[in-house]
Amino acid sequence: MIEWLNNIDIELMVFLNSFNNEYFDHVFWMISGKLTWIPLYLTVIAILFRKNRKQAIYLLLLTGVLILLADQISSGIIKPLVHRLRPSHTPAIEEILHYVNGYRGGPFGFVSSHAANTVAFAGFFSLVFGNRTFTVISILWALLVSYSRIYLGVHFPGDILGGLAVGVFAAFVTYFIYRKFSRHKRLDGCCEQPFSGSDINVATTVLLANTGIIFIISAFL
């Protein structure tokens, strides 16, 4: 059964990775870059501090817990235990895959930390903000970042699915902590007040604009 699933994963990887061109090389290289999304992160931080200083600090601490949880489960626990080679280091297919800028990543790829971290971030703040539009756009963003890892040839689809599962787990665990302690007397019930819809729309707009700029810039590279 495991061998059958692995063979399907390999075939799907080769198929999906085969759809490439120079334009999308630039697009997905930037989408996969962690620094690319700094405008989104700064916007979310600004929204938090516009509402309530105590809640902002509380949520920033929890965001640290969120990313630490997602990243450590994926990179610190699962990868060293499973030892599944990335497609870029798998002898059967490494020479036929498409890569960008010679990047092949480390030896092991299950599960994808990119997928885990972006899904954790999107999931957690979707729960915190409670805004349908932001939820849809942020989840699509997380899926786009996740797909970029397949395009770049450094993760199997199975690595991505595993990362998505870790990200969802981290998001719900962190949100549970957020709700559990939000009524603590030191927080003065600050977490019970909903976020402004206009502020959340700004975050959604920044995310869309950030993504759009990537596609535009890539056309001139």
Predicted features, each with a name:
Residues 31-48, 61, 114-117, 136-137:
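Hydrophobic alpha-helical transmembrane segments
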Residues 45-73, 135-136:
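Interfacial segments of alpha-helical transmembrane regions
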Residues 45-49, 70, 74-83, 126, ...:
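Membrane-water interface at transmembrane helix exits
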Residues 35, 61-73, 77, 161, ...:
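Hydrophobic, lipid-facing residues on alpha-helical transmembrane segments of integral membrane proteins
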Residues 18-26, 51-60, 151-156, 194-195:
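Membrane-helix interfacial "entry" motifs
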